[in-house]
Amino acid sequence: MTTPPQPRKATVFHDVRPFGGPARELVAVDGLLVDEVPPGAVVERVDGGGRLALPTLVDAHIHPDKTSWGEPWHSRRPAHGIAEYVAGDVELARALPSPVAERALRLMSHAAAQGTRAMRAHADVAPAFGLSGIEGVAEAAGTLAGIVDVELVAFPQHGVVRTPGVAELLAEAAASGLVTHIGGIDPAGFDTTGDRDGDQLGTVFALAEKHGLGLDIHLHDRGEQGLAPLRDIAARTSALGLQGRVSVAHAFAVAGLSARELDETADLLAEAGISLTTVALSETTILPFRRLAERGVRVGLGSDGVRDSWSPFGDADMLHRAWLAAWALDARLDEELEACFRLAADGGAELLGLPRADLRAGSPADFMLVDGECLPQVVVDRPRRDLVVRAGRVVARDGRLV
């Protein structure tokens, strides 16, 4: 006896205003938006109440393993330089009552409820932690499967060559099957060899090539100390055929370039297929993402650390991060405010290799409903996410997962 085929399911979101336009319906089938309900489909209807429909967002750079989100308040000590901040990471990790998996899940769930559909998460790999950070974030990501997509970076925050044992742990992480990327950090300024021989970039590029992983390297150094490693990364990327699989985070040296130097550097990065991420710290550190995009460089926006030993601030809300980008750039015009939202929505999606959630037929049914008149106003007001939809399924209401 043949079992009759099950009817398709369609969810119709009624009375929504994509990007603040006229009210209409959005129809989701099999995780995608479609023009109309298929014949014979079983229909579920959701009332949008005239709210704006906007794409959900992508956090291209976040550190969930370090967070104290939801934990007792932690008073921070003065710190100067990466080495002292790193020592603070170890101190905080030992002081927090909850393991990485619980803290990361708490933060990542909050991010998803605020409209984050995907993230690239960095987790520290060092003798002080072993692989516990990676394992904890991977566990949290598994719990949230189908709600938020997670790429995971094995990040050598303590340095690859300055801290014995890190290179071996990175190799273990690369072979674990848990990570999608290998990280790196300031090979010229922080992770210097001193009296030890070592080549951080050589180590991480070799691991990425061997295991078929991507690379995501932190570069905080400014001036030539930051630009020289950037050129080295571009050269290694091209030589190994890793175009499209390498990202550089922060890249503060790029933020301070003249127009001519910026275009030259952008062309170098575009040719090597290297992406950048920015975290909108200030007007002197945020990357000129619109000009970089014009020259062919993909740029994503990220939360960075959230309430960790480095800073008491951060909330993993990417709409807030778009607001911070607009504030750092002194955005006034509607098009400038919209560009900051697009950075959070489309920039990160392109960096992670995801299709844009642009609310058109054929695009992922990933969107959020908010009160507001228009997109620029939403960036400024940061209204509550009344409804968050992932693959056509309501996953959060009123800022909380359902």
Mark where each language-model region is:
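Active-site gating loops and adjacent loop-to-helix segments of metal-dependent hydrolytic enzymes
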Residues: 67-100, 229-247, 265, 316-332
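His/Asp/Glu-enriched, well-ordered alpha-helical/loop segment
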Residues: 235-246, 290-372
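Alpha-helical scaffold segments that flank or form the walls of functional sites
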Residues: 70-122, 128-143, 171-175
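C-terminal cap of metal-dependent C-N hydrolases
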Residues: 34, 361-402
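Active-site core of metal-dependent hydrolases
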Residues: 147, 151-164, 176-287, 307
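Divalent metal-coordination and catalytic microenvironments
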Residues: 16, 31, 50, 61, ...
